[in-house]
């Protein structure tokens, strides 16, 4: 059994209705902590009821309530729809309209699940907030550090890079040292009906995967057609709206050419999609903005060799980073990398420790 090493405490558990957070609630309850379950209603979940493998749908709220009832712990459902729309959905839509590839789960963790939920937990008199994320919090010489989960297949550190130092002190991640299989065994041991519940696979507010319909609903007439231009300067055809394209995309371009073409750049100002050969996707360096830094401060002229991830599914790559003012950094790969997409996160690691990260800008070369 994993023990948090804390004395008996009042702990709020963010309960999504899935097996991970349910196992956390059961684990902490068995250890004698005063556990309070909170489930956030984040969007109009009616469209997601009955959808398999979606997150935060009506069924999930019901499952969280059933787990809380079985454990005999208080459980609250909080309506965060307006906060979620403002902080996550609107940002998601606007990012696509700017020709970016957004990452709504990071925005949700940053603003709603951590910032707002920690505030609520404190108001309830809780000492800590626990979640079912597969990451580890390790107490270092200079305070709490964020580390990868021990199970590489389930590590979620990429999605939590915007967690602040203050938030990290308050948070607990009991599953960071477990595999998914071990978590399911724990849930079975506690007799939880969600022990075999499938993992969520989709963006929670787009359970059918059709993000374009969400964008068009919130921002009508957002699929304005425009030019497709080869990186060498000649026009190849017409696109159906920049929201339909992302960096590195090959399929669905609707262009006949003598070699495979990929989306290399998206220009939202002039409504142009640039395409080129695979070699045109190669990137040596880029700039990140809104940097959240969890380690010792980097000096202005200092260059630091690190590992970076530019997509959650890609392995870390060696790079050199340097500061550019208070909230920007330059990232330079030691070897070129393909398809660096504006709007995605660049997360910076030293071994298993998350040093920080930021959002990839258009300043790519």
Swiss-Prot record:
Q: Which InterPro entries match?
A: MnmA-like, MnmA-like_C, MnmA-like_central, MnmA-like_central_sf, Rossmann-like_a/b/a_fold
Does tRNA-binding count among this protein's keywords? yes
Q: Does the keyword RNA-binding apply?
A: yes
Cellular component, GO annotation: cytoplasm
Q: Which compartment or compartments is the protein found in?
A: Cytoplasm
Location of region: Interaction with tRNA: 154-156
Q: Which reaction does it catalyse?
A: S-sulfanyl-L-cysteinyl-[protein] + uridine(34) in tRNA + AH2 + ATP = 2-thiouridine(34) in tRNA + L-cysteinyl-[protein] + A + AMP + diphosphate + H(+)
CDD domains recorded: MnmA_TRMU-like
Q: List the disulfide bonds.
A: 108-204
One GO MF term: ATP binding
Q: Which residues bind ATP?
A: 14-21, 40, 132
User: Taxonomically, which superkingdom?
Assistant: Bacteria
Query: What keyword terms does UniProt attach to this protein?
Result: ATP-binding, Cytoplasm, Disulfide bond, Nucleotide-binding, RNA-binding, Transferase, tRNA processing, tRNA-binding
According to its UniProt record, the EC number is 2.8.1.13
Q: Which Gene3D superfamilies match?
A: Adenine nucleotide alpha hydrolases-like domains, HUPs, Translation factors
This chain's function reads: Catalyzes the 2-thiolation of uridine at the wobble position (U34) of tRNA, leading to the formation of s(2)U34.
| Entries under PANTHER family matching the protein | MITOCHONDRIAL TRNA-SPECIFIC 2-THIOURIDYLASE 1, TRNA 5-METHYLAMINOMETHYL-2-THIOURIDYLATE -METHYLTRANSFERASE
| Matching NCBIfam families | PRK00143.1, trmU
State what protein this is by name.
Answer: tRNA-specific 2-thiouridylase MnmA
Q: Which gene encodes it?
A: mnmA
